[in-house]
């Protein structure tokens, strides 16, 4: 029997339609696809999944709007956006360095930057798991993909 504590649907909710670079849209699509293929997502309470998750930025908060698969609202988990701003900013900076390095650097230089990028991504994932602690339980791979989506939400175009 497949586990039921998982996401069956995930959407980024944005007030305005944002046109992002093709690379960013590709990263978003891959993160969503990978999440739906395999994830562990268990909101605190007597809830039984699968779940639909809507992630949105609202004022100074990141909102995880969790619903049943049939869209019945279950719980909204607000997280302070400030918690993630620094790590997202650092992550974007290292990604820019990585993409610049691909064009002109040696393979060993690219690999070093990529290791740093992955390390920062892992740090953001752990921070997300920590902030969701006691509210929503997620495994590390799920947190990594959710962190990718949080980064996508921060891109304004």
From Swiss-Prot:
Family annotation (Pfam families): UPF0262 (PF06793)
HAMAP family tied to this protein: UPF0262
Family in the record: Belongs to the UPF0262 family.
Protein name: UPF0262 protein amb3341
């Amino acid at each position: 029997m497949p586990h039921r504590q998982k996401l069956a649907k995930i959407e980024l909710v944005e007030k305005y339609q944002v046109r992002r670079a093709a690379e960013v849209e590709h990263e978003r699509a891959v993160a969503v696809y990978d999440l739906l293929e395999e994830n562990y997502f268990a909101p605190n309470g007597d809830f039984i999944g699968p779940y639909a998750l809507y992630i949105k930025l609202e004022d100074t908060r990141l909102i995880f709007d969790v619903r049943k698969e049939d869209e019945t609202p279950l719980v909204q988990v607000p997280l302070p956006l400030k918690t993630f701003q620094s790590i997202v900013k650092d992550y974007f900076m290292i990604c820019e360095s990585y993409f610049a390095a691909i064009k002109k650097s040696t393979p060993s230089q690219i690999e070093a930057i990529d290791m740093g990028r992955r390390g920062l991504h892992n740090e953001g994932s752990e921070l997300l798991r920590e902030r969701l602690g006691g509210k929503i339980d997620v495994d590390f791979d799920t947190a990594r993909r959710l962190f990718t989506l949080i980064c996508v939400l921060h891109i304004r175009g």
